[in-house]
Amino acid sequence: MIETDRIISANTAQTNDENVIDRAIRPKTLAEYEGQPAVREQMEIFIQAAKARKDALDHTLIFGPPGLGKTTLSNIIANEMGVELKQTSGPVLEKAGDLAALLTNLEENDVLFIDEIHRLSPVVEEILYPAMEDYQLDIMIGEGPAARSIKIDLPPFTLVGATTRAGLLTSPLRDRFGIIQRLEFYSIDDLSKIVYRSAKLLNLDITTDGAMEIAKRSRGTPRIANRLLRRVRDYAQVKGSGVICFEIADKALSMLKVDPVGFDHMDHRYLLTLMEKFAGGPVGLDTMSAALSEEKGTIEDVIEPYLIQQGYIMRTARGRIATLLAYNHFKLKIPDNLSADQQQTLSI
């Protein structure tokens, strides 16, 4: 897939070195956690209340686009509660026994983090229901007429589920979460603080305007901001004095073909296809997928969310439509053959 080559993709697989760096700069407490003020305030109250009662925190669902800190927040929850974190992902839990092994190894009030929880198989998901509600594990012993069910008591624990596709969760599973938090794209100010903090932890010399320039091109996503910081660091070492200032950041990011609003070649290709090939739309997902030679899931989950959030495209019942902002960004003339309704939509 094309998106795996994108430096600004929050889904891009990371190298071992990058994972080590990310763990080193990852905030450990809510006090270090920048951005998401509503989430931070709520979680601080919920965690303090649970600790005062000496209870496990309510099961927590965290959802939002990739790279916004769902895994980071799960680690913070465990750290703030003073308990262990056991981590896995939906696709890894293929059999009921896989989940049973994890659950039976939990200590009191521990946190079990399941990433991509929407990808749990139905068999595994059914095991979770009594575990979440009653802290009990139902296991079938034997087969056929001799089969019998036994119940194993579990210690109180907190399940933290993370997903980019909250709509794919079944209602019975979603309803069992006592706390549901949505992570939003970060503001430029919050991202610049994250970039500045990461630079200091990596012993990099960075100016305020250098951090701000990286933040502006990071698509509201901390994972992308930290990745761009590492690439700008490389550029500063080779082409500059090692100091990350505005000029160095601008030159490095331009070399990486990340434009001033954070768009890369894939965003440009998507928007130009929509505006030049299809006169601004409306265009259906199947048509865009064929025109771009890209998977529908990648278009919906990776390319479009930021474009929609920033107001460059609209999803309507008839398909995707380029907005006036998109035409202005590329300095393109709005086609004369657009319908009156579409002209009105573009002007909103």
UniProtKB/Swiss-Prot annotation:
Major site of localization recorded for this protein: cytoplasm
Cellular component, GO annotation: cytoplasm; Holliday junction resolvase complex
Catalysis: reaction(s): ATP + H2O = ADP + phosphate + H(+)
Region of interest (Large ATPase domain (RuvB-L)), ranges: 4-186
Gene3D superfamilies per UniProt: 1.10.8.60, P-loop containing nucleotide triphosphate hydrolases, Winged helix-like DNA-binding domain superfamily/Winged helix DNA-binding domain
MF term (GO), any: four-way junction helicase activity
Subcellular localization, as worded in the UniProt entry: Cytoplasm
Entry binding sites for Mg(2+): T71
UniProt region (Small ATPAse domain (RuvB-S)), positions on chain: 187-257
CDD domains from the UniProt entry: AAA
Entries under InterPro entries matching the protein: AAA+_ATPase, AAA_lid_4, DNA_helicase_Holl-junc_RuvB, P-loop_NTPase, RuvB-like_N, RuvB_C, WH-like_DNA-bd_sf, WH_DNA-bd_sf
Region (Head domain (RuvB-H)): 260-348
Keyword list, A-Z: ATP-binding, Cytoplasm, DNA damage, DNA recombination, DNA repair, DNA-binding, Hydrolase, Nucleotide-binding
Binding site for DNA: R315, R320
Domain of life, per lineage: Bacteria
BP GO annotations: DNA recombination; DNA repair
SUPFAM superfamilies: P-loop containing nucleoside triphosphate hydrolases, Winged helix' DNA-binding domain
Amino-acid positions noted as binding ATP in the UniProt annotation, renumbered to this chain: I25, R26, G67, K70, T71, T72, E133, D134, Y135, R176, Y186, R223
Recorded domain comment: Has 3 domains, the large (RuvB-L) and small ATPase (RuvB-S) domains and the C-terminal head (RuvB-H) domain. The head domain binds DNA, while the ATPase domains jointly bind ATP, ADP or are empty depending on the state of the subunit in the translocation cycle. During a single DNA translocation step the structure of each domain remains the same, but their relative positions change.
HAMAP family, per database record: DNA_HJ_migration_RuvB
Subunit structure: Homohexamer. Forms an RuvA(8)-RuvB(12)-Holliday junction (HJ) complex. HJ DNA is sandwiched between 2 RuvA tetramers; dsDNA enters through RuvA and exits via RuvB. An RuvB hexamer assembles on each DNA strand where it exits the tetramer. Each RuvB hexamer is contacted by two RuvA subunits (via domain III) on 2 adjacent RuvB subunits; this complex drives branch migration. In the full resolvosome a probable DNA-RuvA(4)-RuvB(12)-RuvC(2) complex forms which resolves the HJ.
Protein purpose: The RuvA-RuvB-RuvC complex processes Holliday junction (HJ) DNA during genetic recombination and DNA repair, while the RuvA-RuvB complex plays an important role in the rescue of blocked DNA replication forks via replication fork reversal (RFR). RuvA specifically binds to HJ cruciform DNA, conferring on it an open structure. The RuvB hexamer acts as an ATP-dependent pump, pulling dsDNA into and through the RuvAB complex. RuvB forms 2 homohexamers on either side of HJ DNA bound by 1 or 2 RuvA tetramers; 4 subunits per hexamer contact DNA at a time.
Protein name, as recorded: Holliday junction branch migration complex subunit RuvB
Organism: Francisella tularensis subsp. holarctica (strain LVS)
Lineage of producing organism: Bacteria, Pseudomonadati, Pseudomonadota, Gammaproteobacteria, Thiotrichales
Gene: ruvB
